[in-house]
Amino acid sequence: MKHTTLIAVSVAALALAGCKKEAPAGDAMATSAATDSTIPGVTPAAEVQRSPSQVFADTAAASDAFEIATSQLAADKASSAKVKTFAQQMIKAHTESSKKLESAAASATPKIVPDAAMTAQQQQVLSDLQGKSGAEFDKAYAAAQVNAHQSTLNALKAYATGGDVAGLKSFATEMIPAVTAHFNMAKGL
């Protein structure tokens, strides 16, 4: 068994080594650029640090995107009228919240642009919800809403007390009562 594994690893290593594309000998610039991973003045994207305010704005934007996407799904898949009504309220509230966030973030210097890309966890929950319907969907949607609103509430409270951009602090403070109400409504679904 060990012999077979060793052979398989060796074959894979040789195959990868054979895939290496060499730059033409006369193309010293291409060779230099391909091997020089530290170009002065350029920070690789993976190493760029986001400010705490950018992280907060991205978290809030992703939360809004998640709430809207899952609530749009509820319009089709939910069986309970109460869940459907709640979902419509969430679409409206989080669309408005997104606009307020963008306005607050634009007041920052330098300007902050919220990234509404959902986290892997949010995408997974959305994917899981897409596979459910009826009462099963209602139960999973309600649980997702409780968890999402609790996380958002925690982020808002933390930024409201410790944030460093006045516009975003005001946004966080303003949103706490609404998100608290949504959290309590979600617990009642």
Feature locations, PLM:
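His/Met- and acidic-residue-enriched segments that coordinate or traffic transition-metal cofactors
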Residues: 2-9, 13-189
